[in-house]
Curated annotation (Swiss-Prot):
<dbReference type="Pfam" id="PF00231">
    <property type="entry name" value="ATP-synt"/>
</dbReference>
<dbReference type="InterPro" id="IPR035968">
    <property type="entry name" value="ATP_synth_F1_ATPase_gsu"/>
</dbReference>
<comment type="function">
    <text>Produces ATP from ADP in the presence of a proton gradient across the membrane. The gamma chain is believed to be important in regulating ATPase activity and the flow of protons through the CF(0) complex.</text>
</comment>
<keyword id="KW-0406">Ion transport</keyword>
<comment type="subunit">
    <text>F-type ATPases have 2 components, CF(1) - the catalytic core - and CF(0) - the membrane proton channel. CF(1) has five subunits: alpha(3), beta(3), gamma(1), delta(1), epsilon(1). CF(0) has three main subunits: a, b and c.</text>
</comment>
<keyword id="KW-0997">Cell inner membrane</keyword>
<dbReference type="GO" id="GO:0045259">
    <property type="term" value="C:proton-transporting ATP synthase complex"/>
</dbReference>
<comment type="similarity">
    <text>Belongs to the ATPase gamma chain family.</text>
</comment>
<keyword id="KW-0066">ATP synthesis</keyword>
<dbReference type="GO" id="GO:0046933">
    <property type="term" value="F:proton-transporting ATP synthase activity, rotational mechanism"/>
</dbReference>
<keyword id="KW-1003">Cell membrane</keyword>
<dbReference type="GO" id="GO:0005524">
    <property type="term" value="F:ATP binding"/>
</dbReference>
<dbReference type="InterPro" id="IPR023632">
    <property type="entry name" value="ATP_synth_F1_gsu_CS"/>
</dbReference>
<keyword id="KW-0139">CF(1)</keyword>
<keyword id="KW-0375">Hydrogen ion transport</keyword>
<dbReference type="InterPro" id="IPR000131">
    <property type="entry name" value="ATP_synth_F1_gsu"/>
</dbReference>
<protein>
    <recommendedName>
        <fullName>ATP synthase gamma chain</fullName>
    </recommendedName>
</protein>
Amino acid sequence: MASGKEIRTKIGSIKNTQKITSAMEMVAASKMRKAQDRMEVGKPYARRMREVVGHIAAGNLEYQHLYITEREVKRVGYIVVSTDRGLCGGLNVNLFKAVLRHSKEWADKGIETDFCMVGAKGTAFFKSVGANIVASLRDIGEQPSITSLIGSVKVMLDAFADGKIDRLYVCSNDFVNTMTQTPKVERLLPLKPEDGAIHKRSWDYLYEPDAKELLDGLMVRYIESQVFQAVVENGACEQAARMIAMKSATDNAGNLINELQLAYNKARQAAITQELSEIVGGAAAV
């Protein structure tokens, strides 16, 4: 059994760590609320943009945009949104597993994949597994902007336009609630018509000044809005996961302190009992 002094040192060290994890939990909770607000602000725009392009994909276009036209899949691209920092539980690991499963389905068909990484953790992981990373972005901060994402997104859009990839997906975490974040892999390009409910109320558009000019701009805005919303939502997921992870660490530290305190009391009791035994034994000898 460890000595009382050693146990006291361990208890002191764990208490210091507990203070840190407790502070990180509170900071993450505050950041999560702000990230949730940003996520909710952008959702209506992203959702409406998705509806509009869904209608367009289902309509009879006078101009068939490249992003709407289906073609034979020879190469697939992924935009993977991860975090720059760790200490957020299994958030990144679960996402990476989902992406690997999805990409393996294409690999089994003999189709190669390219990756655009957003977040340092994703870049490090996919480099370690030998993935072909064509673009990467890190240190986007807690308040990302569309302008900071344009460069990486443009790499994938140019690749699609040049025929280097024939299908593009965005991969991120979906914020269900504070306790639950689920990985998702969504198809970005080519656009596919929305579900039957939208088909029933779909319509054709009149384009001014002309369909090509309007759709060329609209499609790029659509991709940017979907990727940006994925980044913002992933940020909320990160803070929620970190808050839960730090709460779990704080609780575990408390349990460990209680166990060590009990061990310390037992060690102290044993030491006192031994001293009394020695005193009694010495007195009896006299």
